[in-house]
């Protein structure tokens, strides 16, 4: 009886850590995109960069402002399905939380460029993005996209 209570408490702590890391990483990622990446006109690797590139193409050539969340969720739909099928339900659900939350925050947070120096933006944007990915992996979740493929 006492062992079962301890296991439930440990599981609760583990889930709190998982979702705490997910929320923190999603928030920092959105801030990074709005303060560094977009300010420098950069397109990082992975689905984040592809999402920003598609947004830019829609805006430039068609005059349509497509939300970041919409493109990012559509791009991540296939890796999410693969994650559900082959990696695990808990991991995939927490990763979907990161994908959706970072997308929504990227759409909501106003753009606040810190600097326009491309070298500084590249260095700090990359460091912050790497920190967010590490934070997700520590919490046993991912930022979606190519992370699903790499883990599978």
Question: How does the language model describe each region?
Answer:
Residues 2-152:
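Core subunits and conserved enzymes of cellular information-processing
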